[in-house]
From Swiss-Prot:
Siliques. The lineage of its organism: Eukaryota, Viridiplantae, Streptophyta, Embryophyta, Tracheophyta. Coiled coil: none annotated. One of its GO terms (biological process) is seed coat development. Residues 133-180 are annotated as: Disordered. SMART domains: SANT (SM00717). The keyword NADP does not apply. It is found in: Nucleus. It comes from Arabidopsis thaliana. Residues 20-72, 73-127 form the HTH myb-type domain. Interacts with BHLH002/EGL3/MYC146, BHLH012/MYC1 and BHLH042/TT8. This is Transcription repressor MYB5. The gene is MYB5.
């Protein structure tokens, strides 16, 4: 209870860094890009919170980091996605779902943001035009689109179960003691922006490459994302990895 004559405590809310006094928002100018590139060439990447002040930019650290990572890095490719890259995106999406960071980690020079935008504006529509479900990568069955339940023998009806995000978000590797609490979520966070550092593990990388490079129809030879991945071949390598390689920044 609040004592007599006492003041109600004022709750402090954290405000986004871009709303601080004097911080610029909106599109970056050519001059700002040049300042950021010049500073990073001299001082290197990192320490993003203090970088704007050290570089003389009226931007927040997050804005500087995203501008560098998605646009200004020398290794970043912009536009002109090739047919080979498009085919690889389709294969990886069928295997990994909407895990754009993981997908970008397998396509040199492409950012997760660009791949996500290209998927939503081009590839998703392309699959729909071909009669392919962009989520499951299976043919759309026009006969079952409006059927809420499926008839089975004996007249009994069972509802069709929708594809749950748990099929794609929680692929785990058991630590060996049978305790699910010790399982590792090898695909990271729940928002689709995972750390893909573990992909550099040799065994897992070889395992993933063997699936990606499967020869044949890109819609027919890769494990559907509704089925759990069989991770036995690379389990030891992932479980043995350090916690730093599996964690998030």
């Amino acid at each position: 209870m609040m004592s007599c004559g006492g003041k109600k405590p004022v709750s402090k809310k954290t405000t986004p860094c871009c709303t601080k006094m004097g911080m610029k928002r909106g599109p970056w100018t050519v001059e700002e890009d040049e300042i950021l590139v010049s500073f990073i060439k001299k001082e290197g990447e990192g320490r993003w919170r203090s970088l704007p002040k050290r570089a003389g930019l009226l931007r927040c650290g997050k804005s500087c980091r995203l501008r560098w990572m998605n646009y200004l890095r020398p290794s970043v490719k912009r536009g002109g996605i090739t047919s080979d890259e498009e085919d690889l995106i389709l294969r990886l999406h069928r295997l990994l779902g909407n895990r754009w960071s993981l997908i970008a980690g397998r396509i040199p020079g492409r950012t997760d943001n660009e791949i996500k935008n290209y998927w939503n504006t081009h590839l998703r529509k392309k699959l729909l035009r071909q009669g392919i479900d962009p989520q499951t990568h299976k043919p759309l069955d026009a006969n079952n689109i409006h059927k809420p339940e499926e008839e089975v023998s004996g007249g009994q009806k069972y509802p069709l179960e929708p594809i749950s995000s748990s099929h794609t978000d929680d692929t785990t590797v058991n630590g060996g003691d049978g305790d699910s609490k010790n399982s590792i979520n090898v695909f990271g966070g729940e928002h689709g922006y995972e750390d893909f550092g573990f992909c550099y593990d040799d065994k897992f990388s070889s395992f993933l490459n063997s699936l990606i490079n499967d020869v044949g129809d890109p819609f027919g030879n890769i494990i559907p994302i509704s089925q759990p991945l069989q991770m036995d071949d690379c389990k030891d390598g992932i479980v043995g990895a350090s916690s730093s390689s599996l964690g998030h920044d």
